[in-house]
A protein has these predicted regions:
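Short linear sequence motif anchored by a di-proline
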Residues: 25-27, 75, 96, 125
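Amphipathic coiled-coil/heptad-repeat helices and related helical stalk/stem segments
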Residues: 15-16, 84, 125
Length: 133
């Protein structure tokens, strides 16, 4: 099985720069994309698409392309303030889970509020993942 994770930094731009060729060449079973920055019309034969865009335009968001139908798919953590940013998709398959995560960024210019947001995100994500069956 081939699983690929890729921060595309904007799917529309990435698509213009060889995204579909990469898929055709690499042939991953699952492709997890982060920072899609909104929905972009995409038809990829042989793949099911699972979108989780941010509510804010041109911001964050995740996408999973899968050759197989998962048993279930969950978007987000179930907490609006985190889920509004489209940062997580959880795919359940028969013998495993795939969790596609685009974690909130922190840098030296981050506000104290954003630091608190990230610290809480990390705690909630850890709890979420450890509770997966």
């Amino acid at each position: 099985m081939k699983i690929v994770s890729w921060n595309v930094n904007g799917l529309a731009r990435c698509r213009r720069n060889g995204f579909l060729k990469f898929l055709a060449d690499a042939k991953p079973d699952v492709l997890c994309c982060q920072e899609i920055k909104g929905e972009c019309p995409l038809n990829v034969p042989g793949y099911l698409l699972f979108w989780n865009p941010a509510k804010r335009s041109n911001y964050s968001g995740t996408l999973v392309l899968s050759r197989r139908q998962p048993l279930s798919c969950q978007y987000g953590l179930g907490i609006d303030k985190f889920d509004d940013e489209g940062r997580l998709i959880t795919m359940e398959y028969k013998d495993y889970f795939i969790v596609n995560v685009y974690a909130p960024n922190l840098n030296t210019h981050s506000s104290p509020e954003r630091l608190d947001f990230r610290m809480e995100w990390d705690k909630v994500l850890r709890e979420f993942v450890t509770k997966l069956p």
